[in-house]
Each structure stands twice: as structure tokens, then as C-alpha cells.
Swiss-Prot record:
Keyword annotations: Protein biosynthesis, Transferase
NCBIfam families: fmt (TIGR00460)
SUPFAM superfamilies xrefs: FMT C-terminal domain-like, Formyltransferase
Organism (species): Tolumonas auensis (strain DSM 9187 / NBRC 110442 / TA 4)
Binding site for (6S)-5,6,7,8-tetrahydrofolate: S112, L113, L114, P115
Reactions catalysed according to its record: L-methionyl-tRNA(fMet) + (6R)-10-formyltetrahydrofolate = N-formyl-L-methionyl-tRNA(fMet) + (6S)-5,6,7,8-tetrahydrofolate + H(+)
Annotated protein name in UniProt: Methionyl-tRNA formyltransferase
Task performed by this protein: Attaches a formyl group to the free amino group of methionyl-tRNA(fMet). The formyl group appears to play a dual role in the initiator identity of N-formylmethionyl-tRNA by promoting its recognition by IF2 and preventing the misappropriation of this tRNA by the elongation apparatus.
HAMAP family per UniProt: Formyl_trans (MF_00182)
Keyword Glycosyltransferase: no
Family: Belongs to the Fmt family.
Amino acid sequence: MHNLRIVFAGTPDFAAKHLQALLNANLQVVAVYTQPDRPAGRGNKLTPSPVKILAVEHNIPVFQPENFKSAEAQQELAALKPDLMVVVAYGLLLPQQVLDTPRLGCINVHGSLLPGWRGAAPIQRAIWAGDPETGITIMQMDAGLDTGDMLHKMVCPITPEDTSASLYEKLAIDGPEGMLFTIQQIADGTAKPEKQNNELATYAKKLSKEEACINWQQDAAFIERCIRAFNPWPVSYFKLADLNIKVWKAEVLPNTAQQSPGMIIQASKAGLDIATGNGMLRIKQLQLPGKKAMSFADVLNARQDLFLQGNILP
């Protein structure tokens, strides 16, 4: 395993944790691929990815092609003579020629129990759908979207309190463990690929800011799941008096009186109670424009005028 020439491809912090695990295990990472530096922050300053920052700290050569379609990018990879490519949240499609370049192929760490939630937002969609569990799948990559043979799975329960942020943290522990286990099996020749059942496939489409706008006609339970799924991005919100108010935390209560969806039933230090299509949502933490996220009790002290009982939110 320690003789394998590994190329790592990844971009966000989730991927950086996997690169760190490879380094901690003293594996031979001969190069890192990550997305080009992007503008970030208020100054729109070009910012390197977490994976690039870690690679530079460890003096690992970094490559940042815009895509892998060019012959130059493909030749650069081939010149590294990789045995294995490990891909974690890289964000670029890999053509077949790239997948065929490493002697042992390319493996991917995916944040779901495949074939469920193939695609861009598996962790968020698992919460959004109310799944009781998710996990990590290590797969041998092919040209399809998360369709490759499965090499290893690890199951992770989803608690009623989990947000996408907290679930990411859990899977960022399981993922590196599963990755190292799989690399060892590949090195030993003991990996047992398992085909995916395409009939059971579901797709985790990207999240959008438009999707994060709360529709009070929907069930309180579904809205509450969206709030957790869209934390930390794009963050659920509702409109009130020309303000977009972000919602960070809520709970579901029964709505026995059956008021109109969107009606403010009461505003108290316990929270902001709003009728929905089924049940009542109590908002516990929200964020006014230009302010920090605060408990509703603190917001109420400053802006009681916004949350008048009987008002109906759009």
C-alpha cells in the first residue's frame, strides 16, 4: 500500500480531510489536483481551495486545470505514472482517458449509500427526504454519474437534529476510514466490486437559493427538514415586509386550530409559531438582513413590531 503512487483530486474542506488522512498514513501522494483558485469573500480575492492549501503546506505538486478535456492536462497526469487516483468532491468530470490512466484506476468517496442519491448534493438530499440513515460509498469510478462498482460502504444514522453541516462532520470521519480500508484492499488484491442496481438509483440535484424560500403550504415536518438540509447553505428563508429572513433552527408542533398556512399564531420567547399546510412550525433561531443569527427571543426584544399575531406571511 505504501508503494502505491497516489494522485489525489478534491477541492473543499471535506476533501482536505481525506488528503490529510492519506498523509497521516504516510502514503505516497505524488500530486494533487484541485479546482482553480476562485474569487471569495467581500473583496472577491482569488482564494485557493482547502485541498490546495494543505498540499502546498506539504510541498506536494498542485495541478489546477479548468477541465480534463485537453491533451495537455491528460499528458500531465500520465507523466506522473500514478498507480491510483483518489477523488473526493473534486467538482470536475473525468473523461474515460483520465479514468484509464492510473494502473489501478480511480476510486471515489461519495457521501451516500449508493445507488441512492447519486449526484451533487447527497448529504443535503438525505436530510431533505427524511432518510433515517446515509453513509459513505467508496466506488471504482466509471464514465457515468456515480454509477461505478461499489467497493466499500459505511452506514451513518441521521438524527432528528442533524443539519448538513453536522452530517458532513460525521461523514468526514467515516470517509477517510473507508478510503484507507479500500486502498489497502486494492493493494492486497482483495477488493470485491459490487455492481449498483440502477433501478434503485435516486438523484441528488444541486441546491438552489430559490429552493430555500419557505412555502408555508407545505407540511411543517418537510419545512423543518429543509431548514436542516439547507444549513449551512443556501439557508432557508421567508419574506416579511420586504425582508428576507433566514431560518436556522425550528421545531414541529401540532396545529390543532387549523389556521391558514403562513399565519403567525404567536410570537413569544419560546419561538415564532407559524401555521403550515399541515402542523405548526416554531422558529427558534433566525437571522435578519445584515445581522448575526440570533435566538427568536433576542430578535423579539428588538423587533417585536415585525411579528404581529394574525399576520399572514407570503
